[in-house]
Amino acid sequence: MRAHAPATAAVLAVAAALVLLAALVLTALPASAATVGRSTSTLTSATSTTNAENPVPVALSTVPPAGHRLSSDQVLAIADRLAKMRAVRREYRGSFGDVYLKGGFQWQVSYFDKSGKKEIGLVVIDDLSRRVAEQWTGFQIAWTMARGYPGAFGRHVNSLYIWLPLCVLFILPFFNFRRPFSLLHLDLLALLSFSVSLAFFNHAHIYASVPLAYPPMLYLLARMLSLLRRARSDRPPPSLRLLVPTFWLALGVVFLLGFRIGLNVVDSNVIDVGYAGVIGASRIVHDEPLYGGWPSDNEHGDTYGPVNYEIYIPFQQVFGWSGKWDDLPAAHGAAIFFDLLATALLFLIGRRMRGPTLGVALAYAWVAYPFTLYSLESNSNDSLVAALVLAAVLAASYRTQLAGAGRGALAALAALTKFAPLALAPLLATHGLSELSWPRRVRALALYAAAFAGTAALVSIPALSHDSLHEIYEQTIVYQSNRGSPFSVWGLYGLQDLERLVEIAAAAIALALAIVPRRADLVGLAAACAAAIIAVQLGIEHWFYLYIPWFFPLVMLALLGRLSGEGGTLIEPPPVAASAPARWSRPAAALSS
């Protein structure tokens, strides 16, 4: 009993922290919403600046408007002299510029081709200083998220004094100073290397940021596939030694959770994704059509599955909604809940696989990884996707008929939140079938399929009560398939034909992982699910850093789970001899026997 006391304390500390923090969310958000500040209206889809910010057209004149120093003629002359504008106008003969007042003391000049339908250049000029504040061409006109506005996603989480310490905290407990060139270190660095791409994105260098996102994804895909080989029974698994005792790591989880929630309440912004969840929840509650006819400030917010909007209903009911894109406390509450849920599920999966040490290590990895905080501080729904997939993996750790039905139901929920997890449905369906006789395999597949179909039908009722399947298909699948985006190599360089081949390859990988014999434990399932999601993300035209949490917890499950002992379904840690020193009290806690 003495040997397991610290472990029990760690479990209780994490559980108590999650309960306490959930209670704080429910009590603190309404009162603190006023301190959050005006949320930045960040759009993740293309939108005309003229339409989004409603500048006021100004006729050409030599007389400045009342209260302004510059006239519209002077503003146009300043813009005409810019080398970037001269270059783009040479490409579009007959182009012309229109002048607008933008806000109190800013001017906007928009250049159009001779037809007046295509905006080819945009300049923002400060009236007081006469300085050019912004100048954009190409896709950065329509895609405001490509302009590198400070804090547009996650606000201060992008600051180096937050981001870099998180990177250190993420890798430090897993670093082995005796083996600095271990493969695990390379894996963790690959996960952190998305930061390089993000740094270029934050400075509006899209032609650098987009290609730099692919090497770590390709590496992680190859790494996950390499872990699918069946482990040899005669070879002991490699061990992982944490740099700090498990109890201190559990305290780190509590501290980082508090930091994340505090930062969300006082500093984060709600992007259009979180706003869409609140709008959709309100429409369901008021018995309005879920798809089509959305507000102009989030016109395409109805591009997600119905589950996404239904899960926001409790938060919309508790925190309310003003009908505007304001601080949206409901979106804050939902994002915090999704984050806590993912943390708790990782702990539960790790505890079931090997014991509390692995559970705490996985929970710590989630709360220390900067890109999960990036998602939380943007108040998006991406941690919900991760949580639903993790719940399905947890269900897969049980060998009962009810667990099989649970996998099917959770797979349907994940697929009808965002559609990419649909690639995991075959994997989750076939997990564990190799251990069953043929009659039991058929029954298990039938139960999984029935649970999947039944859940999908049930959660679709609010949408189908007003919208046809065709309308839903048009607003979701068709819109996402047809929208162009510069946030992938396919959209940035016009490689749509190659993109189709990658999409086909991703589908083939997902199907192959479901039927080809592979490692059959939870480590194998996590690695296969991570590989399938990464393969899908490699083939989508609109990729963004918020999607990293979809596969990150699965990658960590595979990487740490394989080091924590043979087999991924061990419930209890290995027994400790009475005469041996307590494993949990060692300065460097070993996860393997």
Where are the regions that the model predicts?
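Transmembrane-embedded, aromatic-rich helix segments that form part
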Residues: 407-411, 420-434, 547-549
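Primarily membrane-embedded glycan-assembly and transfer machineries that use lipid-linked glycans
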Residues: 204-249, 256-393, 397, 430-548, ...
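Membrane-embedded, hydrophobic transmembrane alpha-helices
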Residues: 11-33, 144-246
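Short, non-transmembrane alpha-helical segments in secretory-pathway proteins
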Residues: 62-100, 157-163
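Membrane-interface junctions at the ends of membrane-embedded or membrane-associated helices
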Residues: 1-3, 225-237, 396-407, 429-443, ...
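Exposed beta-strand-loop-beta-strand "reactive/processing" segments of non-cytosolic proteins
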Residues: 86-128
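Extended, hydrophilic extramembrane loops/domains of integral membrane proteins
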Residues: 116-149
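Membrane-interface transmembrane helices that cradle and orient dolichyl/undecaprenyl
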Residues: 168-182, 351-354, 389-406
